[in-house]
């Protein structure tokens, strides 16, 4: 459950069934059993953090969002809006590593305000294999997001960030073939990759 709140329900069920006490202690979550999701919401009640972050907007050159799926977190949008409101967006590059779970028009409208956006789209295969590796993603939705990203503004660069692994190694040629057949205008253009 350290890496994803989606694992918390499974952890609640599985952890009590571990019989080896040494293993059970080793596998204990860092917050010593607090598996209610509270550690994923530390930012919700931390006004001082947000005040200090907003004070730094004039000094920012880049904001990098990796993990936690920024595109589904309201505070991500609030931060981007604060940067735009402060008048510094054209000086700042945005970077993302994301599986593109949700990308509303609001996001693309905000991106238009920034100097540059580099979106590294985490996709590891096609079809059912993608759905399995990137659960709970659905391939049809992933394809839709590919096309939305391919039609973003000129300040947006998009690359596919594929994690080569045992589950997809034999399917990578199919993935590359599919991607090339799409004839995307901007996704992984040379020299960024094929």
Where are these regions (language model features)?
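Catalytic cores of alpha/beta
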Residues: 166-182
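Core AdoMet radical
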Residues: 2-47, 57-74, 84-106, 112-144, ...
């Amino acid at each position: 459950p350290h890496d994803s709140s989606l694992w918390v329900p499974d952890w609640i069920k599985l952890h009590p069934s571990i019989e080896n006490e040494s293993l059970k202690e080793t596998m204990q979550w860092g917050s010593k059993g607090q598996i209610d999701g509270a550690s994923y919401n530390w930012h919700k009640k931390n006004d001082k953090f947000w005040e200090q972050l907003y004070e730094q907007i004039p000094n920012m050159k880049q904001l990098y969002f990796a993990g936690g799926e920024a595109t589904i977190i309201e505070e991500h949008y609030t931060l981007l809006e604060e940067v735009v409101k402060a008048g510094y967006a054209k000086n700042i590059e945005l970077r993302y590593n994301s599986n593109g779970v949700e990308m509303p028009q609001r996001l693309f409208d905000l991106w238009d305000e920034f100097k540059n956006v580099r979106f590294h789209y985490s996709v590891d295969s096609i079809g059912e294999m993608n759905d399995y590796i990137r659960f709970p993603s659905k391939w049809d939705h992933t394809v839709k997001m590919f096309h939305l990203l391919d039609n973003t503004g000129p300040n947006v660069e998009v690359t596919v960030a594929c994690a080569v692994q045992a589950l997809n190694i034999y399917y990578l040629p199919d993935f590359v073939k599919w991607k090339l057949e799409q004839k995307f205008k901007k996704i992984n253009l040379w020299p960024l990759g094929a």
